[in-house]
A protein has these predicted regions:
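Glycine-rich beta-alpha loop elements in corrinoid/cobalamin-binding modules
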Residues: 12-160
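Non-catalytic, alpha-helical, charged scaffold/linker segments
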Residues: 1-3
């Protein structure tokens, strides 16, 4: 049906070659796959219902990258007035030295690291008529005069973990999900089988010495634990 299909990692191989945009760009200019067709149909239904001014994609892993680009491409072609942003683990690690202007055929903003304040400023820019050269941004790539620019010009500080709020799952259709275990390893069932409400217990890593991890990044090296009281309050709110 679709050679790129995976339960949770669609077209992951393409996303893993982050040192070059060529293969992904060629794929995006190819015909829609079977999975593309029904994904974009659902996306169109939601866009027509909500009529947003800004659409944001969180891309944590390579297996989420293609779908984000394909969806952004669809929005650009059919809803040109909607602004589009991308953030998450993948750009945080793989797009820190972004230079390829073609990425901005799909996205208007790409943010790095903690997302609360960058997204707040992106939102303010997206709904205002302010010229992008006059706007404030936090760790955000934009395209200006056909050049990729990294802007970090706000004096505002990131939000502390105690003030980011409690996740809202009220519109998540949990009763319509199925449990899928991709491999036989029973350890994987601990975090992939059934429903889990996940909460952030700390920002960053208290250890910060693993050689396989990029501990130079702020969202890893800046350790900020959350108090037990706040965690319990958030559990009760959920």
């Amino acid at each position: 049906i679709d050679a790129d299909f995976g339960f949770s990692r669609y077209a992951e191989r393409i996303g893993q070659s982050a040192n070059s945009f060529e293969e992904l760009y060629e794929k995006l200019n190819d015909q829609h796959t079977f999975t593309d067709e029904f994904t974009l149909k659902i996306l169109q239904e939601k866009l027509d219902l909500v009529q947003p001014k800004l659409v944001c994609f969180s891309v944590p892993f390579p297996g989420n990258l293609y779908a984000a680009f394909r969806s952004a491409q669809f929005i650009k072609a059919n809803y040109p007035n909607i602004k589009i942003a991308m953030g998450g683990g993948f750009p945080n690690t793989e797009l820190r030295e972004l230079k390829d202007a073609r990425v901005f055929e799909f996205f208007d903003y790409i943010t790095l690291d903690d997302g609360e304040l960058p997204l707040e400023l992106v939102y303010e820019n997206a709904i205002s008529n302010k010229n992008i050269s006059e706007a404030e941004f936090k760790r955000t790539f934009i395209l200006e005069n056909k050049e990729v620019k990294y802007i970090n010009n706000t004096a505002r500080s990131d939000y502390k973990q105690a003030f980011v709020g409690t996740p809202d799952y009220s519109n998540l259709l949990l009763d319509q999900y199925i449990s899928v275990i991709e491999i036989a390893n029973p350890m994987h069932s601990l975090w992939s089988d059934g429903r889990w409400n996940k909460l952030t217990m700390a920002h960053g890593c208290y250890w910060g010495k693993c050689t396989f991890c990029d501990i130079s990044l702020d969202y890893i090296k800046i350790y900020e634990p959350i108090s037990a009281k706040i965690l319990v309050d958030r559990m009760e709110e959920l």
